[in-house]
Each structure stands twice: as structure tokens, then as C-alpha cells.
Amino acid sequence: MKKITLFCLLAAVMLFAASCRHSEKTIVFQNYEYEDNPFAETDDTVGVQFSIKIQLPLLEKATEAQRPLMQAMTDSLLTRLLEPYYNGKAPDQAIKDYCDSIRSEFNDWALLDDPTESGMPNYQWIQELSLVPELETEQMLVYNGSIYAYTGGEHPSTTTILFLFDLNTGKQLTEQELFNWAGDAPNSESYNAFVELMKGMIRKMCDATDDFTADDIDWDNVAPNGNFKVTKDALVYHFDVYEITNTNAGPIDIVLPNHEVKQFMKEGTVLYNYWFKK
């Protein structure tokens, strides 16, 4: 039995304290959900599983002044998560197009075998996409995005995409804006020192766990990858499995305390001010 639901739900309203330019910032999260799980457990569908689940709490335009900022952040989120199916469309239409494409791909794949000839096939296709708002400050918002896919085999694929937004501009903050080793005039000495900081933190992780060792790390590829978020007191770089680790180590988060990162930062950014100008 096919069941698809697509709806919008006002999920949360958060008030941010006054900034130097705005007396109040009101951010409304509108939750877009889509579920498709068409195969009931019957004799005809034993071993067949197909499901899509999407949960995207996107930013809504609470005021006219916020409209371009919220739209810019939505564009950044959906372009990364739903590519190539988002091209300025309404979010619900982009989500539907994305899911229809996955369903079509599953149908083509499932028809490759004839269950009447090969016995009951074990078709499993699970796709889940989610966003979680994490750190929320007066001037920044962190999102943690995850794309989970399992189409058979030994293990699923999970891709984590992190977003750090400047709420004053609607821009996604990148290494170029934040660090002195990036941008128009990169500092190679600073960059190399930053890489060594990352490697040093991984070595500490290896020493502190029995789950993996230094032999499970591809040390030549340890470097800033642009996939980072921030917490109240740390910078966190995320690497999916195979980027710098094997399946034994799995995905890895490199947590760098802000006092260690300070020497590499450009002053005056919203992140620098949040950490060091309180």
C-alpha cells in the first residue's frame, strides 16, 4: 500500500536578542516532511523494502526585511541537499521531484530481476534526508544535514553536510571568510600549522580509543575540507568514511577547541566576535 504525505508544519519560533542593527530577530522554522513507504508486508512483498523519509526544517520569512536573507539560506541548503532537483523551485516541489526521481530509479533497478524465475528477491532501498538546527545565536545558525542511503550490500552510505550561516547577511560562512590561511592571500605557513593541529587532535583520538588506530587514518589527506560547524567553544570538522578513514574507523569528527583555533582566525568576523568578544 502506497502512502505519501507531504505537509508543512510550523515547528518552532525562536526570538534572538537585539543586535546592533536590529531590535529583534524572529526566526520561524517551517518543517517540510515527505514519506513514501509503499510496500506492505505481504507474501508478495516479503524481502521488498523501499522507503523515503525527508525532514527539512527550513527558515521562513518572518518579516519583509528578512525575506532575502531567509531565501538565501534556503537556496544554500536545498542546492546542496537536493541537487540537481532544486533550481529556485518551491521547497515542496523540489522535494517531490527529488523523491520521484529516487522512486523511478528504484523501479528500474527492481525490474532487473524477475522474482518468478530467481526466487524472492531481497530488494532494499532506504533513503533518508534530514536537517537539524544546532547552535543558534544572535548572528549565527548551524545546521547539520544528513543523507542516508542503503541499496543493499554490506553497509549503507551516510553523507553529512554542515552549514554555518551568518544571520546578518544570509551567507554561508566559509573558510575563506574565517581563517587567515584561506582567501585571497592565503598564508601557507599558517595553513600547514592548522593541518598539524588537526593531525595532532586525531592522534589524541587514536590514543583514547580501542575502536581504531593510526593505521586506519589516511594521513596524507588530512586537511581542511570545508565541511565544518561550530559549537559554543569549538570548531568541528567532519569527514565521512573513506575521506580520511577506512570502514574500521568510520566517519570522524575532529574537534578543535576555540582557544587552539584563535591564532588562525581573521578578527572581526561574527564567529571571532562570538567566541572572543563577549
Regions found by a protein language model. Give the residues of each.
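Compositionally biased intrinsically disordered regions enriched in Thr/Gly
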Residues: 20-278
